[in-house]
Amino acid sequence: MSKNKPQKSLNTGKIQIIHGMHAVRAALLNTKRAHLELHITENNHEFAKNYKSAIKKITILDQKEFKKLYGGEKSTQGIVLKTNDFERPSLQQFVKNENVNDKSVLLALDQITDPQNIGSIMRSCALFNCKGIILAKDNAPDLTPSLYKAASGAAEIVNYFRVTNLKRSISELKKYGYWAYGFDSSEDSKSSNINFTKKSILVFGSEGKGMRDLVKKECDEIIQINMHQNKHYQIDSLNVSNAATIALYEFFKS
């Protein structure tokens, strides 16, 4: 391990910066990546020792150097990895390679742009065996350091499909046997007691606006998650990541 002061590195091209213990650990375990450099604070020496075989260069920084480069340890936990991204399948490639008889669930997120929410949803996807997240690429965030950290390693295994047209992608998936369930709190929604099909798309809109009408019309069923609403304090809706987790659990146990 070297203690030479490194140059500040940024995400360029296929080079990615990942920080946080869980996100970095998962990336280091991903054999599809080619890792370039690990920057750690002195108190993370033991963490680095466990992954010496996976990384070309490990640089130990004192607190002052690390803070100058990365702004302190609060968000990074004193662990920053510079790594090459790996090739991810397109939605079309995924569907064509999928076994038609396999049980499969995908999430479609309409105009959900917050990396923290998407990272949290991705983590739930990993835990409930969801195959991937679909978003329109014109408003979907890149795989940023904050998204990787929020996903706690799940970004290494959950597909991230950025498509040109979300409505069209849902329509195309239905040709492969998928059934689209839109989750919405409107009065015309059905209760959440449903029988999922073997291949399902769970569709969610943004917390403020919900699904756009054109996406909603593409759904085969509109579902409402049953819950107690506190009208007095105006607590009447779930965070989208929580709603997605509930929906994934319902599919998982079906």
Name what the model sees in each region.
Residues 1-99:
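N-terminal positively charged helical leader segments and presequences
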Residues 25, 30, 126-127, 148-152, ...:
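Structured adenosyl-cofactor binding patch, chiefly the S-adenosyl-L-methionine
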Residues 43, 63-66, 138-140, 207-209, ...:
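Short, acidic/turn-prone active-site loops that include or flank metal/cofactor-
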Residues 47, 140-146, 209-218:
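Short, glycine/polar-rich helix-capping loops at beta-to-alpha or helix-loop-helix junctions
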Residues 59-64, 158-167, 223:
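Short acidic-hydrophobic, aromatic-tinged amphipathic segments that line or gate anion-handling sites
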Residues 92, 96-187:
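RNA substrate-binding interface of SAM-dependent RNA methyltransferases
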Residues 181-237:
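Active-site/ligand-binding-proximal alpha/beta "capping" segment
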